């Protein structure tokens, strides 16, 4: 298990847990590990980008200094999205890419995530190799001198190459569709107008004026309520909300209903399936996807494959089994036909393309997914794994599952960061879901609760 790396890179409160000193060390260690097998006849190249957080420039300078100190050529992208970095690695044939962002988290946080030469997030073994260098008693990495030091080059045309890529993933423009777009005051803020104007949409924007502190602040994919108002007030056909680094997308239909990642996956999957383009007729989901999605998938002749929470697990399953569509309820949608990581703007464009090609409203496309009421109970416990071998807890779960008789779901899972056990139930009615969740939670509390 990694010490510094979480499910999405290294993350913490900027200037405290994620300090400039740490960024420098990550630049040296990460840069060395990711370029040590590069062609010795040419200087290794690494792309660096950031989102709009106030701490971004501070960490960027330190990170780049670390990279330069091990002889790496840095292409600086400035403010751009995480999926843009992953895409441009391949365009530039770079050894790696690094994004400075804490995604959907508040401005006080920041993070550093690495991508390999293939544009994918790093495997655990590579992260562990970087951590071993960070924890070594002394720094034994190379310290080149003179012409051996790295250099920095600005790469402003990267944004244009990325937006052109997005625009060419659909066969036609999106003229005739009216859309409201929420940029979360993040990385997509400077790209939205260019893309949606080029695609000839009638668009309005909100949360596209970052000031370093307002990223994700009551806006974006984790706070779509403002976008709902914007859609209804403007009479838009739909709304799209991205997160701070642009790898998530949540939509809003013309009636003001929130269309989460589950519904987006269904809409895209159903469209691809009908066109014979959904590989193995399978959508890859995580354990947090609603039972309503699974019922809709099955009712429409498709299948699902399930992974643990985290888009990296979805990507691993897709790569291993040859699937081309997957994602999370939170709005990370991966469409392997075009990209190898979650991309909010790509997802939004594909969703609008389905609307244009079918002539259907977003509410109509999402209607087959009837989301079941869900209740989540977090319980502080003495031992997060004790529930697995506790007979009374297992019996309580079995009893509820038998009562559900296939018309509901129980998911019990430990928190990855806190001494909590999460009990999640889904059922056909609010009354039933409350009853079932409370029933199991009461037994957990009495058996292993603190």
Curated annotation (Swiss-Prot):
Q: Does the keyword Magnesium apply?
A: yes
Q: EC class of this enzyme?
A: isomerase
- State the active site: 103 (phosphoserine intermediate)
PTMs? Activated by phosphorylation.
Which InterPro entries does the annotation name?
A-D-PHexomutase_a/b/a-I, A-D-PHexomutase_a/b/a-I/II/III, A-D-PHexomutase_a/b/a-II, A-D-PHexomutase_a/b/a-III, A-D-PHexomutase_C, A-D-PHexomutase_C_sf, A-D-PHexomutase_CS, Alpha-D-phosphohexomutase_SF
From what superkingdom does this record's organism come?
Bacteria
Co-factor: note: Binds 1 Mg(2+) ion per subunit.
What cofactor is this protein dependent on? Mg(2+)
Entry's Gene Ontology molecular function annotations: magnesium ion binding; phosphoglucosamine mutase activity; phosphomannomutase activity
Q: E.C. number, please?
A: 5.4.2.10
List the record's Gene Ontology CC terms alphabetically: cytosol
Modification sites for Phosphoserine = 103
Where along the chain is Mg(2+) bound? 103, 243, 245, 247
Q: Which residues pair up as cystines?
A: none
Question: What is one Pfam family matched by this protein?
Answer: PGM_PMM_I
Which keywords, in A-to-Z order, does the entry hold?
Isomerase, Magnesium, Metal-binding, Phosphoprotein
Catalytic activity reported: alpha-D-glucosamine 1-phosphate = D-glucosamine 6-phosphate
The Gene Ontology biological process terms listed for this entry are:
carbohydrate metabolic process; peptidoglycan biosynthetic process; UDP-N-acetylglucosamine biosynthetic process
- What is the recorded function of this protein according to its Swiss-Prot or TrEMBL entry? Catalyzes the conversion of glucosamine-6-phosphate to glucosamine-1-phosphate.
Similarity comment: family membership? Belongs to the phosphohexose mutase family.
Q: What is this protein called?
A: Phosphoglucosamine mutase
Species of origin? Latilactobacillus sakei subsp. sakei (strain 23K) (Lactobacillus sakei subsp. sakei)
């Amino acid at each position: 298990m990694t010490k510094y790396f979480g499910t999405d890179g290294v993350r913490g409160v900027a200037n405290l847990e994620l300090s400039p000193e740490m960024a420098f060390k990550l630049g040296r260690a990460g840069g060395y590990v990711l370029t040590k097998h590069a062609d010795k006849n040419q200087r290794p190249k690494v792309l660096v980008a950031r989102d709009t957080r106030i701490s971004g420039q501070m960490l960027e300078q330190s990170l780049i200094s670390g990279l330069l100190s091990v002889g790496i050529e840095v292409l600086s992208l400035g403010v751009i999205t995480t999926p843009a970095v992953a895409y441009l690695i391949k365009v530039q044939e770079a050894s790696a890419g690094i994004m400075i962002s804490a995604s959907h988290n508040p401005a006080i946080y920041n993070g550093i995530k690495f991508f390999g030469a293939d544009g994918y997030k790093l495997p655990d073994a590579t992260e562990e190799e970087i951590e071993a260098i960070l924890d070594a008693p002394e720094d034994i990495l190379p310290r080149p001198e003179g012409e051996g030091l790295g250099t920095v080059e600005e790469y402003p045309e990267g944004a244009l190459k990325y937006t052109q890529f997005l625009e060419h993933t659909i066969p036609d423009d999106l003229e005739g569709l009216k859309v409201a777009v929420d940029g979360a005051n993040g990385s997509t803020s400077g790209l939205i107008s260019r893309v949606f104007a080029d695609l000839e949409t009638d668009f309005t924007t909100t949360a596209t004026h970052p000031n370093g502190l307002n990223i994700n602040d009551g806006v974006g994919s984790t706070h779509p309520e403002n976008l709902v108002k914007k859609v209804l007030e403007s009479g838009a056909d739909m709304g799209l909300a991205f997160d701070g680094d642009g790898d998530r997308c949540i939509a809003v239909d013309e009636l003001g209903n929130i269309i989460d990642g589950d519904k987006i996956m269904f809409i895209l999957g159903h469209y691809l399936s009908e066109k014979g383009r959904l590989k193995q007729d399978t959508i890859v989901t995580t354990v947090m996807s609603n039972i309503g999605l699974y019922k809709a998938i099955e009712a429409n002749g498709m299948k699902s494959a399930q992974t643990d929470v985290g888009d990296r697990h979805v990507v691993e399953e897709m790569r291993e089994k040859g699937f081309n569509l997957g994602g999370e309820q939170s709005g990370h949608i991966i469409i392997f036909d075009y990209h190898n990581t979650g991309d909010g703007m790509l997802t939004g464009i594909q969703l609008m393309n389905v609307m244009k090609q079918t002539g259907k409203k977003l509410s109509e496309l999402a209607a087959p997914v009837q989301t079941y009421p869900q209740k989540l109970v977090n319980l502080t416990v003495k031992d997060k794994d004790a529930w697995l071998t506790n007979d009374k807890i297992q019996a309580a779960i079995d009893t509820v599952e038998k009562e559900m008789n296939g018309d509901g779901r129980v998911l019990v899972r430990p928190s990855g960061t806190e001494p909590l056990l999460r009990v999640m139930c889904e059922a056909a009615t609010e009354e039933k879901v409350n009853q079932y969740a409370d029933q199991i939670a009461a037994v957990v509390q009495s058996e292993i609760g603190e």
